[in-house]
Amino acid sequence: MLWAIIILPRLTNGQQLPQIPKGYWIACGDDKVLIINPSISSDSSAVIWKWQFKESADQIPEEYSNYFKSIDECKPVFANKKILITSSTGATCLLNIADKKIEFYAKTPMAHSADLLPGHLVAVANSTHPKGNSLELYRLEQPEKPIYKDSLYSGHGVVWNNKLQQLFVLGYDDLRTYRLTEAKNSLTLVNTIKIPGLGGHDLSLIDDDRLLVSSTDAVAIFSINERKFDPFIPLADTHHIKSVNWNAKTNRLVYTKAEESWWTFNIYATSPNQKVHIPTLKLYKVRVCY
């Protein structure tokens, strides 16, 4: 008789995680990024992998130690093998999970979100800062050298829609759509629409046709084809959503909301209901691996 044993990743600092399993969460805040298996528990014991900037600080210029003090985006990319990280204290990087190697870095003032585009490009949304308030485009092979820049007040969200070949960008009060030029070295603004409410905060992809948009006092579903917003009923009475992820097929909702100021110690989920409490980190965003 053969017995099959399935072992879920449960790592210590000395072990490697080559790829984040589907259904796991990535959370970030302060100078740290965590990978969480929500099926383990609802406290810090659910953390199966963690990274602090100082672990990789010697790989890039020393000044970056000042720029990764408040991480505010931790997006899984490259088939969940890497994490795209931004920090409001002034930088963006691409981190390989297995060896914690920084593969791209750039000074991005008050960066709040980033995403990958075809052609090894990365787009970054920068929020309110004398050198920020912008959308920037970089090549992964050329750290610190933006190849395109557009003004964007209080940039907070960036999402690439691969089916439509469009980049969606969230600012303070508008949602923009860009196309990548044929030469893949610039972006063209296609259209702009006002969002319901002010203080655009998070932008995430539901599917090829819909986006989730959070602002200070509301969360809405944006229909790309119809170009209209509808209230997101599950969070209709919840304010100050900092990050929101919704799987429409399973109805699984995972989000963070400001509770202590702009941060929280909790990650919330529904279907089933769950609250993961991590008291040692000022959590800002959570992302889900699909």
Predicted segment positions?
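Blade-loop segments of beta-propeller domains
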Residues: 51-82, 87-90, 98-113
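Repeated scaffold domains used in trafficking and secretory/extracellular systems
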Residues: 61-75, 107-117, 152-160, 196-206, ...
